[in-house]
């Protein structure tokens, strides 16, 4: 029912958009040459950390992206983002975001915004480009990889911004809160696969990974199993355009219940706190750090299947003219803290590791960009005892991307 509602809304807003005269249509094509020694990718049913594994060497489609924006009125805008990865998902081209945004004209130093639809929570300071992409690296940090895999706000978000700098103050402040549904499955991938580092976003009507192979074939994301709204609330501050901070608390408020046949799993109750800082001391340098810590658990049995998870990263980027160089260090950990299977397997599951990412980008022309990225990810994953792989692995991946944006 929820997916039918989203599809009906999609058709309705696109019909409304068709009546508008002015619109923006973006096209992005990303082609890559890949070399990897990584273990079987998490996107193909394995426990590797990276998007591509040792069987994926050669030319690959990074993505084909379409973005659509139209101003329906002076204060109302519609945004749609669609993407194709060429990895045989349920739909060859699928939506990642679709929402309407209302920004009433500010009559004072306070400005409101209301978003309704399906969109990303404003947690990331890294993924700043249209299509929720990063200008710094090809692969997202572990934190934002997970956001792209399992989190989407399907509901409404209200923001209230104090325009302090327009009034001569040193800072702007923003407060936001959202209510959402269709995210009772958040935590499924984190518990079963651990953290990852890639840029493959889950789509609104798709399955995780290649044709749903990484999880059971019928596993669907973004489903509403308990008819109970989740929420998040946060605040952001921007000091003179030099320092930006974001703080969020997220809770999907999933009601625990037995296995649901729609996902062949239980609903997962997931909550976390996130703090991010972005510092731009000069026109050339950008420093970003983000921290996220939370818990997720399922099962109506006792003890519950419970996990604690956290990750943090530090990214430094230098840009001058057509060149940009970026480096990022990630730490990540997820640890099972309770299990109703402990009597059978004798140990708790978990994932612990760190990764280095280096990237260099050159803008070749107005529409063409070349990006070279290398990742080394070290991880120890207890679940690998079931696949016969070494528990501790060092995985490396190189990608050379040629990107067209218009």
Model-flagged regions — what are they?
Residues 18-22:
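Sec/Tat signal peptide C-region and signal peptidase I cleavage site
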Residues 53, 99-102, 118, 242-406:
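Outer-membrane beta-barrel pore domains
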Residues 24, 103-114, 149-314:
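Signature for the C-terminal beta-barrel architecture of outer-membrane proteins
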Residues 7-17:
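Bacterial N-terminal signal peptides
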Residues 23-36, 55-192, 236-243, 315-337:
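Outer membrane beta-barrel
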Residues 34-62, 220, 260-261:
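Surface-exposed strand-loop-strand hairpins of Gram-negative outer-membrane beta-barrel proteins
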Residues 1-4:
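Positively charged n-region of N-terminal signal peptides that target proteins for export
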Residues 60-63, 79-81, 94-97, 151-155, ...:
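Transmembrane beta-barrel architecture of outer-membrane proteins
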């Amino acid at each position: 029912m929820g997916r039918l509602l989203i599809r009906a809304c999609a058709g309705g807003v696109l019909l409304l958009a068709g009546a508008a005269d002015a619109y923006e249509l973006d096209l992005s094509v990303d082609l890559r040459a890949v070399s990897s020694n990584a273990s079987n990718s998490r996107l193909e049913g394995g426990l590797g950390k990276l998007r591509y594994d040792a069987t994926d060497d050669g030319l690959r489609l990074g993505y084909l992206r379409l973005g659509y924006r139209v101003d329906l009125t002076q204060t109302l805008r519609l945004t749609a983002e669609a993407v194709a990865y060429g990895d045989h998902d349920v739909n060859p081209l699928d939506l990642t975001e679709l929402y309407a945004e209302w920004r009433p004209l500010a009559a004072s130093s306070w400005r409101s915004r209301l978003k309704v639809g399906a969109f990303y929570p404003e947690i990331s300071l890294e993924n700043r480009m249209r299509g929720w992409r990063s200008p710094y690296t090809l692969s997202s940090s572990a934190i934002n990889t997970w956001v792209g895999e399992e989190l989407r706000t399907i509901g409404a978000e209200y923001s209230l911004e104090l325009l302090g700098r327009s009034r001569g103050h040193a800072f702007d402040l923003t407060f936001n809160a959202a209510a959402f549904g269709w995210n009772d499955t958040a935590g499924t991938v984190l518990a079963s696969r651990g953290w990852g580092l890639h840029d493959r976003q889950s789509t609104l009507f798709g399955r995780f990974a290649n044709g749903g192979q990484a999880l059971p074939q019928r596993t669907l994301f973004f489903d509403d199993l308990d008819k109970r709204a989740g929420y998040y609330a946060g605040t952001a501050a921007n000091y003179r355009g030099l320092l930006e901070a974001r703080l969020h608390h997220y809770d999907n408020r999933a009601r625990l219940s037995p296995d649901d046949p729609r996902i062949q799993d239980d609903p997962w109750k997931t909550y976390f706190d996130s703090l991010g800082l972005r510092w731009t001391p000069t026109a050339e340098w950008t420093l970003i750090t983000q921290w996220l810590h939370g818990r997720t658990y399922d099962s109506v049995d006792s003890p519950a299947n419970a996990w604690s998870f956290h990750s943090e990263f530090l990214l430094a980027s230098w840009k001058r003219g057509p060149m940009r160089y970026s480096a990022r260090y990630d730490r990540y950990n997820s640890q099972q803290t309770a299990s109703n299977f402990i009597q059978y397997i004798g140990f708790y599951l978990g994932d612990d590791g760190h990764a280095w990412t280096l990237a260099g980008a050159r803008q070749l022309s107005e529409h063409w960009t070349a990006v070279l990225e290398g990742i080394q990810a070290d991880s120890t994953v207890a679940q690998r005892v079931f696949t016969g792989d070494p528990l501790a692995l060092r995985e490396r991946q190189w990608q050379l991307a040629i990107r067209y944006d218009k």
